[in-house]
A protein has these predicted regions:
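Walker B catalytic acidic pair
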Residues: 105-109
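Switch/connector loops and helix/strand junctions flanking conserved nucleotide-binding motifs
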Residues: 30-32, 55-56, 110-112, 147-149, ...
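Conserved P-loop NTPase motor module
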Residues: 1-23, 30-45, 49-51, 67-75, ...
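Loop/turn-to-beta-strand initiation segments
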Residues: 18-19, 41-44, 96-101, 131-138
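Secondary-structure capping and boundary motifs in well-ordered enzyme cores
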Residues: 96-99, 103, 115, 119-122, ...
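Conserved helicase/translocase P-loop NTPase motor core
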Residues: 45-100, 110-115
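Conserved ATP-driven motor cores of ASCE-family P-loop NTPases powering translocation/secretion/packaging/pilus
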Residues: 120-209
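Short, polar loop motifs at secondary-structure junctions
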Residues: 25-28, 144-145
Length: 209
């Protein structure tokens, strides 16, 4: 996996780059300027937990969010089983799932409603099988809480980080420590846990070869 500092003010994530993990600041209510997802999707599912908390839902947030994640997992598993039956020549008809872009915004908030077990099950299915069955998932993290399965999330094809995060967030998700040491600088000793080297519009990117 290569790590680089993207200074061209834009990062475009194409289908081959999924699943993608976006690390951004907690006070950001919109996608970073210059960051784009390039997927020709038939459907888009944006699970915006903060918006759901603000506007409310007909059911409890635990039920609402849990059911959305369960539906996605069930859909991927169903197509995986269909593909297996086709491979065994039990089914002749070729069934291709529609392309779905899924944005989980944000994963740290989702955890609060589905718990560790639910989140781990969802991530495992999506990271291993989602893209294979046309489910392209972007995981957004705005607060790197201790309970997040970081080692599992590092299996994402692409990791993109914006400026001004806590220094430990970068070191948790990016393995090239020597490279990080050369680019992560602090502006003030009173804020030694805050990285201020990046200019607005720059991105730290890691992609699997």
């Amino acid at each position: 996996m290569s790590v680089f500092l993207e200074e061209n003010l834009t990062v475009t994530v194409s289908e081959k780059d999924f699943p993608v993990l976006l690390l951004t600041s907690n006070d950001s209510n919109s996608k970073p300027e210059g960051y784009n997802l390039d997927v020709d999707a038939d459907n888009i599912l944006h699970i915006d937990v903060a918006k759901m908390m603000l506007e409310g839902t007909d059911r409890s947030l635990e039920d609402e969010i849990g059911s959305k994640l369960f539906y996605l997992m069930n859909d991927v598993i169903r197509y995986a089983n269909i593909s297996k039956l086709q491979g065994y020549k039990i089914l002749d008809e070729s069934l291709q799932p529609k392309k779905t872009l899924v944005i989980i915004d944000s994963l740290d908030k989702v955890y609060a409603f589905v718990g560790e077990e639910g989140l781990f099950a969802f991530l495992t299915i999506m990271l291993n099988f989602g893209k294979t069955y046309n489910c392209f998932v972007e995981f957004v993290i705005k607060d790197v809480i201790d309970v997040l399965p970081i080692d599992l999330l590092k299996d994402c094809q692409t990791i993109v980080a914006t400026p001004s995060l806590h220094k430990e967030a970068y070191y948790s998700f990016f393995d090239d420590k020597d490279f990080l040491d050369t680019i992560l600088e602090t502006q003030d000793s009173h804020f030694e846990n805050i990285v201020s080297h990046f200019d607005k519009g720059h991105f730290l990117v890691s992609k699997k070869e």
